[in-house]
UniProtKB/Swiss-Prot annotation:
Gene that this polypeptide is encoded by: lipB
Keyword Magnesium tagged: no
Binding site residues for substrate: R72, G73, G74, E75, V76, T77, Y78, H79, A139, L140, G141, G152, F153, A154
Physiological role: Catalyzes the transfer of endogenously produced octanoic acid from octanoyl-acyl-carrier-protein onto the lipoyl domains of lipoate-dependent enzymes. Lipoyl-ACP can also act as a substrate although octanoyl-ACP is likely to be the physiological substrate.
Source species of the chain: Gloeobacter violaceus (strain ATCC 29082 / PCC 7421)
Additional information: In the reaction, the free carboxyl group of octanoic acid is attached via an amide linkage to the epsilon-amino group of a specific lysine residue of lipoyl domains of lipoate-dependent enzymes.
UniProt main location, coarse: cytoplasm
Stated name of the protein: Octanoyltransferase
Pathway the protein acts in: Protein modification; protein lipoylation via endogenous pathway; protein N(6)-(lipoyl)lysine from octanoyl-[acyl-carrier-protein]: step 1/2
PROSITE patterns found in the cross-reference section: BPL_LPL_CATALYTIC (PS51733), LIPB (PS01313)
Residue ranges constituting the BPL/LPL catalytic domain according to the UniProt record: 32-207
Length: 222
């Protein structure tokens, strides 16, 4: 069973976490013997566009919001407090070199998390993400270089859903939902360890606490 270091830094500005991912990806590509990493965190309010996303899906003046175009796949989405974001930095050569498999496996992690809270999560044919109660509850968008991953998934636990009204989320005009609508009182703090456990189970790895600084070091410290 492989190791996966779990980094849980709390509330992190988007640009900071983006740079961490880039550094972790570069380190993982250069040092294939390093363990995989899973970052679980929240962001202050921010909007991001995928590499080929249509800017018309931003329904307000871009100057009025914090907005970044990233190298991930997918359309525009919102991140903010109450949404649990996962950034796996995985070397897929140790799993399967198949991006379709990777996306479906991330979805399976989230479906199993929802099941732990008594909520039935579902896939929808032709789309990426997870739905529950007829609403999209989790979005995915990834970047892969030399079979090492970055970006990942966002699970709406109890975010400000009004923030999604400023965009066409993931290019879909259908409603966005949250776990708290289906499981009242649930919090990110409750969901986060469940996500870590489901990730370990589905990917067949052992998650253990890690230190970001050690994982970025030139000399292996993690």
């Amino acid at each position: 069973m492989g190791r996966c270091l779990l980094i849980e830094p709390g509330l992190v500005p988007y640009l900071t976490a983006w740079e961490w991912q880039r550094q972790l990806m570069a380190t993982r590509i250069a040092h294939r013997d390093r363990p995989d990493v899973l970052m679980l965190l929240e962001h202050p309010p921010v909007y991001t566009l995928g590499q080929g996303a249509d800017a018309k899906h931003v329904l307000v003046d871009p100057a009025s919001i914090e907005l970044y175009r990233t190298e991930r796949g997918g359309e525009v989405t919102y991140h903010g407090p109450g949404q649990l974001v996962g950034y796996p930095i995985l070397d897929l050569t140790g799993y399967r070199q198949d991006l379709h498999w990777y996306l479906r496996t991330l979805e399976q992690v989230l479906i199993e998390v929802l099941a732990d809270f008594g909520v039935q999560g579902e896939r929808e044919a032709g789309f990426t993400g997870v739905w529950a109660g007829g609403r999209k509850i989790a979005a995915l968008g990834i970047k892969v270089s030399r079979w090492v991953t970055m970006h990942g998934f966002a699970l709406n636990v109890d975010p400000d859903l009004d923030a999604f009204a400023r965009i066409v989320p993931c290019g879909l005009t259908r409603p966005v939902g949250s776990l708290v609508q289906l499981c009242p009182g649930v919090s990110v703090e409750q969901v986060q360890p469940v996500v870590a456990c489901a990730f370990a189970r589905v990917f067949g790895v052992q998650c253990e606490p890690g230190a970001l600084e050690a994982c970025l070091a030139v000399k292996p410290g993690c």
